[in-house]
Amino acid sequence: MKHWNLKRVLSLLLVVCMVTGLLSGVSAMAEDQTANYHEISTDGLKLATEDNAAADETETEEAPYADTDVVRVFVVLEDKPVLQQGYATRGIAGNAAAMAASKALEAKQAALAAEISANVLSGETLNVHWNLTLAANAMSVDLPYGKMDEVEALKGVKSVMLVPQYSIDPREQADLNTISSGNMIGSYNAWLEGYTGAGSRIAIVDTGLDSDHPSFNSAAFDYSLLVTSTKNGKQIADYNLLTAAKINEVLPQLHAAERYEGLTGNALYVSSKIAFGFNYIDATLDITHDNDQQGDHGTHVAGIATANRYVENADGTYTYADNGVVGVAPDAQVVVMKVFGKNGGAYADDYIAAIEDAIVLDCDSVNLSLGSAAVGFTTSGEAYFDNVMDSLDETDTVVCMSAGNSGN
């Protein structure tokens, strides 16, 4: 229990860092390693949750569609999702009762999909994108706009709403304050106490990763782990690293496997540093920025969290990253979940599917640094997504989502 609490403290440090967009790393540990803390008043702030939606949110009319237009919708079922049935996220893939509960929800979703196909779509097969059961009990499906009310009237259906889709805002530029952030969040002190993220798994749900970037070099990561384990009197095996074999063990529970036929743990495992990579928006293994126009924001965020503290030299030796970035948890593994790609911006159901996979993979922290400063409004689909995110507050996985990326 003590070990888990310490890991959770490190995860919370990551939350502080990522949601403020302050830290992409430091050149080296500053001479003054005393942490300075600044209290920030939250007086007058309110969260735009379902509970205060009437007071603080503006509900807009859904986009005008013709009845025959096919749209992507959430079909939310009445039963509670698995995590709201009292199951912990930690080790959930090995929890037989939790997995049985998930299968039971999937069975009801399958029966409902068959009913929709037969009675609403006149025998046409319903196209299902995701069957969500852990954080949400919902199917995301393609449906004629004019059929939404008919589906919502079916027994066992709680609600039907459009799935929000998000896009990268090209007006926003990286504006990171990195000089004093290490002191502000106390990462230097955490490192001095031995908390470097070793044994942690951090999921980045974003635009992907530059997998060839030296900040994520596996040899340098392995060297750093050796240094850390030796200093702490441990073996690298003590850190329970995510491996291809461990991914294979939970593969049947991963949404990624539903979208990619013949998927294996070896294909998802990139390296000891980049322990997992999947493209949820395009249903491919391409997690890079090379083949789309969605930008390299994901690499920036992954660097904030996990950039290595050593770089590999040409002669095979290693040097501290004096002239590069060092993440808050440099010894943590990064789990890359690309939700922006060739098919454009992510849908909210892609986010949830990625989060559920991160939970199955036993990630300690899940980051969605996807907020925008652009003025917007809340639709019913966005309110539902917010509610799903809020429900994760009570789990033992730290899930954080930024309110914006333009704070200064």
Across the structure, where does each feature detected by a protein language model lie?
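Bacterial N-terminal signal peptides that target proteins for export
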Residues: 2-13
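Sec/Tat signal peptide C-region and signal peptidase I cleavage site
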Residues: 26-29
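Subtilisin-like serine protease catalytic core
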Residues: 31-32, 68, 189-278, 282-347, ...
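Inhibitory N-terminal propeptides of secreted protease zymogens
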Residues: 31-170
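Active-site-proximal beta-strand/loop segments in catalytic clefts of secreted hydrolases
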Residues: 76-80, 143-144, 163-165, 204-208, ...
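Short, solvent-exposed loop/turn and secondary-structure capping segments
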Residues: 86-88, 153, 162, 170-175, ...
